[in-house]
UniProtKB/Swiss-Prot annotation:
Start and end residues of each stretch annotated as Disordered: 211-356
Sequence ranges of Low complexity compositional bias: 211-238
Protein name: Probable DNA-directed RNA polymerase I subunit RPA43
Alphabetical keyword list: DNA-directed RNA polymerase, Nucleus, Transcription
Native source species: Dictyostelium discoideum (Social amoeba)
GO cellular component: RNA polymerase I complex
Length: 356
C-alpha cells in the first residue's frame, strides 16, 4: 500500500505564516481488502501521512480535506493485486523558515540547551550559546535565572524565539532557535499544565549539609564571628541527602593490619602417597594375575580332556574303518575266486561239447 505525489499546487503563499495550504494529486495503490469500500481505503492511506515529513512538500502534513476521486474505476496493472487510482486532496503543511518567530513551551531544561514543543507536537531546541548571557543556570532549582530581573526559564515557560535552522530527516523535522534578540524574542508567559506534566521528571538533587556538626566547627574556627550562615535543610523531603562521614573516612590513611599468629606450613608428602598407591595397585594386579592363571589352567584342563575324548573317538573310528576295509577286500577276493571257478567249469563244458 503506497502513495505517490504527482503534482503540487500551492494555494496560499504567506510571508510570515509557517502553515501553507497545498492542493496535491496523489496516485494510490490500495490493497485487495479495500475493494468493497474505496473511500475507507483512501482514508486509511491518508491517515498514515499525517504528522510525517514529505520532501515533495518541504514540510510536515498537519491535516487533509476536500478529497476528490478523479477515476470512476480502479485499475489493476498486470498481475499486481493492488488497486491503482488517482485522487485530488488539499493538505495543510507546516513549513517553518529561517528568521521566523515561533512560540514554544519549555518541556526540559539542562545545562546545555532548552527543549521546547511548538504547537504541542513539533520539537525545537535552543542551545545555551543562543540564550542571553544575563541568564545563568541554577543547579539547585534546575532552571535558567536572569541575574538582574530574576526572571526564570523552567519547565512550562512560554518562549518566543527566532528560527535559525530547520533540519529534516525521513519523517520529522528539527528546529533550532535563538532568543538573543531581545526586541522580538523572550519570555511571554507560563503554562501550568506543561509544568505539571514534565516538571516532576527532571528535578536535580542537591547535597545536604548536616547543620549541627558544621555549626560547631564553624564556631570554633570563627571565634564568635557570625558572618557565615547555614540553612537547615533536614526537614526538606525533596532534597536527597549525602553523608559526609563516608567522605572523611575515605580521606583517612588506611591502618596496617598486624597478624600476631605465625602462619602454619602444611607439608604434604606426595611421594609416600604415590608409593602407597603403587603398592595397592601391585597387590590388586597380583590378585588379578592369580585369578587369570587359575582360569587359564581350568580352560587348559578342559581343552585337554576334550582333546583326549576326541582322540579316543578318532581311534575307534579308524579301527572300524580298517575292519570294514579288510572285510571288503576279503569279499572281493572270494568273488574273484568264485568267478574264476565258474569260468573254468564253463570252459570244460565247452570242450566236452566240441569233442562230441
Amino acid at each position: 500500500m503506497t502513495s505517490k505525489i504527482v503534482s503540487v499546487n500551492p494555494l496560499i503563499k504567506p510571508v510570515e505564516n509557517c502553515f501553507e495550504e497545498m492542493k496535491v494529486q496523489l496516485s494510490l495503490q490500495l490493497p485487495p481488502m479495500d475493494t468493497q469500500s474505496l473511500c475507507s481505503g483512501t482514508k486509511s492511506m491518508l491517515d498514515r501521512l499525517v504528522f510525517k515529513y514529505k520532501t515533495e512538500l518541504g514540510g510536515i502534513i498537519i491535516s487533509y480535506y476536500d478529497v476528490i476521486h478523479t477515476d470512476k474505476e480502479a485499475k489493476i496493472f498486470y498481475d499486481s493485486p493492488y488497486l491503482g487510482m488517482n485522487i485530488h486532496v488539499k493538505f495543510l503543511v507546516f513549513k517553518p523558515f529561517k528568521d521566523q518567530i515561533l512560540n514554544g513551551v519549555v518541556k526540559r531544561v539542562s545545562t546545555t540547551h532548552i527543549s521546547l514543543l511548538v504547537f504541542g507536537t513539533i520539537s525545537a531546541s535552543i542551545p545555551k550559546s543562543n540564550i542571553p548571557k544575563s541568564f545563568a543556570f541554577d543547579h539547585s532549582s534546575n532552571m535558567f535565572m536572569n541575574k538582574q530581573t530574576k526572571a526564570t526559564i523552567s519547565v512550562g515557560t512560554k518562549i518566543a524565539f527566532k528560527v535559525i535552522d530547520v533540519s529534516a530527516d525521513r519523517h520529522n523535522i528539527g528546529i533550532q532557535g535563538d532568543m538573543t534578540d531581545l526586541t522580538s524574542t523572550g519570555i511571554i508567559g507560563f503554562d501550568e499544565n506543561q509544568s505539571l506534566q514534565f516538571g516532576s521528571q527532571y528535578e536535580t538533587p542537591n547535597k545536604n549539609v548536616k547543620n549541627n556538626k558544621y555549626n560547631n566547627n564553624n564556631n570554633n574556627n570563627n571565634n564568635g564571628n557570625n558572618n557565615t550562615t547555614l540553612i537547615n535543610t533536614e526537614n526538606n523531603n525533596n532534597i536527597t541527602k549525602f553523608d559526609d562521614d563516608s567522605e572523611k573516612e575515605s580521606e583517612e590513611e588506611p591502618k596496617p593490619i598486624i597478624i600476631k599468629e605465625e602462619p602454619k606450613i602444611v607439608s604434604v608428602k606426595v611421594e609416600s602417597k604415590k608409593v602407597v598407591v603403587k603398592e595397592e595397585e601391585q597387590k590388586s594386579s597380583k590378585k588379578d594375575k592369580d585369578i587369570k592363571k587359575e582360569k587359564e589352567s581350568k580352560k587348559r584342563k578342559k581343552d585337554s580332556s576334550d582333546e583326549s575324548d576326541e582322540s579316543e573317538e578318532d581311534k575307534k573310528k579308524k579301527s572300524t574303518k580298517k575292519e570294514k576295509e579288510s572285510s571288503s577286500k576279503k569279499s572281493s577276493k572270494k568273488v574273484k575266486v568264485e568267478s574264476s571257478s565258474e569260468s573254468s567249469e564253463d570252459e570244460k563244458e565247452k570242450k566236452k561239447k566240441k569233442k562230441k
